[in-house]
């Protein structure tokens, strides 16, 4: 079970539109209680997304996870979806909401793509994962939201081999990997980079 979080109190509400911190915290505590009652062995991963405004919240988030028995993960906050990363990399306009996200990011798209381009020859993580939407349609990739990238309308009518072949041989995937965009979210999640940039005080634990 995975939980997404971007800070404590008002900082959480800043990057989770319409969300309320008190409700989020109460739900985390309920989840911990239900897990203890029904399935104590269930893994709960708590993902803390590092922005420029929430870095000081990390110690409280860590204490919360320790108290509830959640496994704490952390990563630099990404600009999603990859459509937006590609637009920034191409110098194209992005939405006002995406601009706001960029202003809050601790690790910029430019920094990420500089590293990702150097890793462009490394494999694409997403080729091993199939994105099936609620309507059974299959997209090229779980990280690209462009509706024109739907490969098949019904997951139940095609084989895994057909899906894999359509993605690997597609122009979209070739171009994405040639530019290194497929590595962008791996860079955002690089914990060694987080330590190197002192993004959060995790070094104190080592």
Describe these PLM feature segments.
Residues 178-179:
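Conserved core architecture of multi-subunit DNA-directed RNA polymerases
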Residues 204-206:
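Iron-sulfur (Fe-S) cluster-binding modules
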Residues 1-174, 184-202:
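Radical SAM enzyme [4Fe-4S]-AdoMet core and its adjacent flexible, acidic
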